[in-house]
Amino acid sequence: MNHLDRLERKIGYRFNDIALLKQALTHRSAATQHNERLEFLGDSILNFTIAEALYHQFPRCNEGELSRMRATLVREPTLAILARQFELGDYMSLGSGELKNGGFRRESILADCVEAIIGAMSLDQGLAVTTQVIRNWYQQLLAEIKPGDNQKDAKTRLQEYLQGKHLPLPTYEVVNIQGEAHCQIFTVECKVKSAGKIDRTFVAKGSSRRKAEQAAAEQILKELDIK
């Protein structure tokens, strides 16, 4: 059994075209044939699959409640938890710079890799099989999730915290965009002033402006120890 056989067992899916899995595991720092296009595809499929599952699971919830629960289930920290369960860091291909910086442990890289694997599965065997695999991954998370304030996304929770303390709201600014139009990486600076323990700028990256802003807000919430 090779190392990718072991990974396939962990994710509960066997590829017909193993090259797709290899590409899904390849970070842009390692090769020109990397996983960002697959990540783009997987992100959309994951959002649809979780949205459909929540729609049927919570027939009395409104659109806002469903959106918040979906955001909780597909956000970067949740995907990073799945990645660690699969031990994706042991299988990823990273450039030397990312390896030195511990990229195989970074939440954003792990989360992107999960989405890329979803995209690869959809190209390999289609949507029906892929959505079932995703449901298998999320079985426990879907069973545990409930509507409520704790499902609000990071930006909303940060804004409400600052408003409650009568502090200035954070400002978000895109400071860099890398890559071609179909696979861009956004770098966002989030500035927070006089928020108790912090008064500084946080920097985060994501495959969209929204993801980068949410990642920056998550950093601040962790700094403030807000669950």
From Swiss-Prot:
Ranges for domain RNase III: 4-126
Top-level taxonomic group: Bacteria
Cofactor: Mg(2+)
GO annotations of cellular component type: cytoplasm
Keywords for the protein's UniProt record, in alphabetical order: Cytoplasm, Endonuclease, Hydrolase, Magnesium, Metal-binding, mRNA processing, Nuclease, RNA-binding, rRNA processing, rRNA-binding, tRNA processing
Protein EC: 3.1.26.3
Keyword check for Signal: no
Gene Ontology terms describing biological process: mRNA processing; regulation of gene expression; rRNA processing; tRNA processing
Protein family according to the UniProt entry: Belongs to the ribonuclease III family.
PANTHER family: RIBONUCLEASE 3 (PTHR11207:SF0), RIBONUCLEASE III (PTHR11207)
Assembly mode: Homodimer.
Function, in words: Digests double-stranded RNA. Involved in the processing of primary rRNA transcript to yield the immediate precursors to the large and small rRNAs (23S and 16S). Processes some mRNAs, and tRNAs when they are encoded in the rRNA operon. Processes pre-crRNA and tracrRNA of type II CRISPR loci if present in the organism.
Protein's name according to its UniProt entry: Ribonuclease 3
Organism encoding this protein: Haemophilus influenzae (strain PittGG)
